[in-house]
Each structure stands twice: as structure tokens, then as C-alpha cells.
Amino acid sequence: MGSMSVWHWVIVAVVVMLLFGRGKVSELMGDVAKGIKAFKKGMADDETQPTNTTSVPPVGPNDPVRTLPHQGAPGTAPQQTHVPAGDHKAV
């Protein structure tokens, strides 16, 4: 009962053919094939396009580290402020 035999699949195929008819099934399979072809074409187009389209030059191993104004120097921890235990507010 756990595995499906060939006869189960034949019966399922016959029921599908009766419900949808020969024209609908072939039309559906054609649409699936067109979708697969379009997907493959899209994947091939992505491979031919250059991946680096930004104008920012890549950072080399000897370039200095750039920091934003609100950041500290690299390797320093931000200042921690102490809040007394009774002053916490629920959000």
C-alpha cells in the first residue's frame, strides 16, 4: 500500500485525460516547455552580462580602512553608558 504500481499511474493518467481532454493536456505541456526554455534563456543572459556594474573601485589589501563620521577608529568599542537598575522603561 506504500508504493504506487504502474497500474495506479495508468489510472491517474486516464482520469486526467478524461477531465482535461487531449487538447488541454498538450497545451499545458507546451506552456511548461516554453517556460523552461524562457528560464534557460534568462539564465544564459545573466551569465553573459558583467556582474560588476558599480562605479566604486574595489578595495585592495593595502588600502586604508574608511570610517564614517559616527564610527570610531577600527578596533575600538563604542562607549557604554550605565543605566541604573530601576530606571529601565518598558517599550
From Swiss-Prot:
Q: Which gene encodes it?
A: tatA
- UniProt record, GO biological process: protein transport by the Tat complex
Q: Does the entry feature the keyword Oxidoreductase, yes or no? A: no
Q: What keywords are annotated for this sequence in UniProt?
A: Cell inner membrane, Cell membrane, Membrane, Protein transport, Translocation, Transmembrane, Transmembrane helix, Transport
Q: Which Pfam families match?
A: TatA_B_E
Checking Gene3D superfamilies in the record gives: 1.20.5.3310
Q: Name one GO molecular function term.
A: protein transmembrane transporter activity
Q: How does it assemble?
A: The Tat system comprises two distinct complexes: a TatABC complex, containing multiple copies of TatA, TatB and TatC subunits, and a separate TatA complex, containing only TatA subunits. Substrates initially bind to the TatABC complex, which probably triggers association of the separate TatA complex to form the active translocon.
The record's InterPro entries line, in alphabetical order, gives: TatA/B/E, TatA/E
Compartments it resides in:
Cell inner membrane
| Annotated organism of origin | Methylorubrum populi (strain ATCC BAA-705 / NCIMB 13946 / BJ001)
Q: Provide the function of this protein.
A: Part of the twin-arginine translocation (Tat) system that transports large folded proteins containing a characteristic twin-arginine motif in their signal peptide across membranes. TatA could form the protein-conducting channel of the Tat system.
Instruction: Write out the GO cellular component annotations.
Output: TAT protein transport complex
Q: So what family is this one in?
A: Belongs to the TatA/E family.
Q: Which residues form the signal peptide?
A: none
Name used for this protein in its record: Sec-independent protein translocase protein TatA
TM helices/strands, residue ranges = 1-21
| Major location category of this protein | membrane
Give the membrane topology. Single-pass membrane protein
> What's the superkingdom here?
Bacteria
Q: Which residue ranges are recorded for the region named Disordered? A: 42-91
